[in-house]
Amino acid sequence: MPRLFVMLPAYNEERCLPPLLRAFQKLFAELPASYDPLIVIVDDGSQDRTARVARNAKKKGFPVELVKHERNKGLGEAIKTGLNRCLDHAEGPDDVIVCMDADNTHPPRHVVEMLETLRVEDADIVIASRYRWGSRQHGVPVHRQLMSLG
């Protein structure tokens, strides 16, 4: 059975992770039974209780693995660490890795569309972007949208 890895680089996301994990729990219940899901949370030296949230989710039986950086190394290193951990667990060519922000600004429901695109297009990679022409950002405060412009 192919694995579905959801890799979440996280820095001080104790408030955002619980609703995001609940959304993934709902999504996993709706996924075809052909995927074995695992969420890999990379806590990039958070100063809050991000790691505790991940550990508690695992204790409740949720498919979560926590990887912790002792100090903040930045988003790039968190992504690299997370991808390497997913690859350590990969079992075959049909495994899928989804990388999303842990701040709950990307609705997990889009994962289903991405999986369908992989299947229909026989693609190796699908990139979803809120910056694509005609796309919109939902749930992101205006000041954060402006900061993203550079």
Language-model segments: what does each one mean?
Residues D43-A51, N104:
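A conserved acidic beta->alpha catalytic loop
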